[in-house]
A protein has these predicted regions:
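Extended beta-strand/beta-hairpin segments
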Residues: 1-155
């Protein structure tokens, strides 16, 4: 079951011509870029490690991490936990194949120095219920959320 939005807060709009290789998404003069292809994805050839332009997976990871970081802040505030100023989120989105079908999967590393591991883990998991990107992919892709060393004892 899908949930309909009652009030639209923001609309991100792009117009794409061609494919990743041939075209580029552009929107309202704030986003105008050329995307790189993920190498020769149709063959079993190693992908280029460094691309001249961002890949769609990087853009998705960037948008998701910004949203998820905000969700962490909302959840922490509700739980009366002060997040450290050096808290960080790293999201990696993989494009891959199983048989002839293409899929994405993601890894999220959350760092909350000074926050007890169990508290950080509870905040990180609850943030998935708040973040629209996490909700969009829930049950659709494999997502591993990891709490990276917090340097604090259990609460």
């Amino acid at each position: 079951m899908t949930t309909k939005i009652q009030t639209v807060l923001l609309t991100g709009k792009t117009h794409t011509t061609g494919s990743r290789r041939e075209g580029a998404p552009h929107g309202d003069d704030r986003l105008d870029l050329q995307l790189s292809t993920p190498g020769n994805a149709g063959n079993d050839i190693a992908f280029t490690a460094i691309q001249a332009h961002p890949a769609a997976e990087q853009l998705f990871a960037g948008a998701w991490s910004a949203c998820y970081t905000g969700a962490l802040g909302l959840v922490a505030k509700a739980k009366k936990v002060t997040l450290p100023s050096d808290m960080s989120v790293d999201i990696e989105v993989d494009l891959g194949k199983t048989g002839s079908a293409y899929f994405i999967q993601a890894r999220i590393d959350v760092r909350m120095p000074g926050v007890a591991h169990d508290v950080a883990e509870a905040i990180a998991q609850a943030a998935h219920d708040v973040c629209p990107y996490s909700k969009a992919v829930h049950g659709n892709i494999d997502v591993a959320t990891n709490i990276v060393a917090t340097d604090a004892v259990a609460a």
